[in-house]
C-alpha cells in the first residue's frame, strides 16, 4: 500500500510543477515577504482609526515619491488600504509564518481526481532522479501568496513529508478499522439490549442441555441393560424348553429300561426255580422220550419276529415279585401232533401256580 501511495504522489508531482508554472510565470513571481515586516505592517492599520493611517502615509511619503519618480516622475499618492484588504494581508502574513503543518489531509486539497485517474497514465513508475513534491498550499495553489513553496531539489524534506504522509494514511486506515469494529460491537450491544432474554435463553438452553445429557446417558444405559436382560431371559427360556424336551425323552427311556430290568429279574427268578425243580422235570422228560416223541426247545434259539415272547415285559405293571421259595418253577409242554416242545415261560408258570392255588 505504501508503494502504491508513493507512485500516486510521484505522478501528482510530475504534473504539479507544470501546472504551477503555467499559473505563475517565473518572471512575475514575487519573492516571499519577510514575516516580521508583514506582521508589523498588518498590525499598524486598524479598520476604524483613520487618524493612525494619516501619519503612516506622511511617514512613508518619501517612498511613494521615489517610486513615482522611477516610474515616470508622476507623483501618485497610495490610497488608504481597505479593511478587507488589511484582513487578507493579515491572513497572508500569518500563513507565511513557518510552522509545523498538522498531520491531516489538507495538503491533498490541490490534487484532482482527473490527475490521479488519468487514462493516459495507467502505470506510474518512479524515475531514478525524480523526487516527490512538497505539500501543496492550503489555498489550492491558485494565489501567489498561498502556502509555503518548496523547491524540487529539497530531497530530504520531500522524503520526510512522504514518511509523514504514509504514517497519516496508516493511522487513517487504523481509525477506519477501529470505527467499523466499534460499530459492530455497538450493533451487537444494541441487539443484546433489544433482546435481553436472548442471552438468558442461551444460558438456560445450555443448562438444560447439560442436565439432559446425563439423563440421556442414564436412559440409554437403562435401555441397554433391559435389552441385555431380555436377551438373557430369552436364552434361558429357550434352554429350559430344550432341557424339558430332553428330560421327557430321558424319562421315557428310563421307564422302558425299568420295565426291561423288571422282566429280566422275573425271568432270572423263574430260571432259578426251574433249576431247583430239575429232578422232577428230568423224570417227566425221560418218560416222554420213551413214548417216541421228539423233544425240542427254544431256550437257546432266537425267537422269530412276531412270535410271542413271554419273557418280554407286559403292558400292565406286574405284581410285586415274590420270594424265591414261592416262585413257580414249571415248564410249558407244547404237543403239536407228533412233536412235543418244552418252553420256559415265566408267565405260564405264574398262571399255572395261580390256578393250582385256586
UniProtKB/Swiss-Prot annotation:
GO molecular function: DNA-binding transcription factor activity; identical protein binding
UniProt KW keywords: Nucleus, Phosphoprotein, Transcription, Transcription regulation
Basic and acidic residues bias spans: 16-26, 49-68
Location of region: Disordered: 1-92, 119-163, 176-218
Gene3D superfamilies named among the record's database cross-references: 1.20.5.170
InterPro entries recorded: bZIP, bZIP_sf
Biased composition (Gly residues): 139-149, 176-185
Keyword Plastid listed: no
Annotated Low complexity bias: 127-138, 205-218
Main localization category: nucleus
Location within or outside the cell: Nucleus
Origin superkingdom: Eukaryota
Cellular component, GO annotation: mitochondrion; nucleoplasm; nucleus; RNA polymerase II transcription regulator complex
Record's keyword annotation contains Transcription regulation: yes
Position of sequence motif HCFC1-binding motif (HBM): 307-310
Domain bZIP: 208-271
Span list, region Leucine-zipper: 236-271
Residue segments, region Basic motif: 223-230
Subunit structure, interactors included: Interacts with HCFC1; the interaction inhibits CREB3 transcriptional activity. Interacts with CREB3; the interaction occurs only in combination with HCFC1.
Protein family according to the UniProt entry: Belongs to the bZIP family. ATF subfamily.
Function: Strongly activates transcription when bound to HCFC1. Suppresses the expression of HSV proteins in cells infected with the virus in a HCFC1-dependent manner. Also suppresses the HCFC1-dependent transcriptional activation by CREB3 and reduces the amount of CREB3 in the cell. Able to down-regulate expression of some cellular genes in CREBZF-expressing cells.
Entry protein name: CREB/ATF bZIP transcription factor
Recorded name of the encoding gene: Crebzf
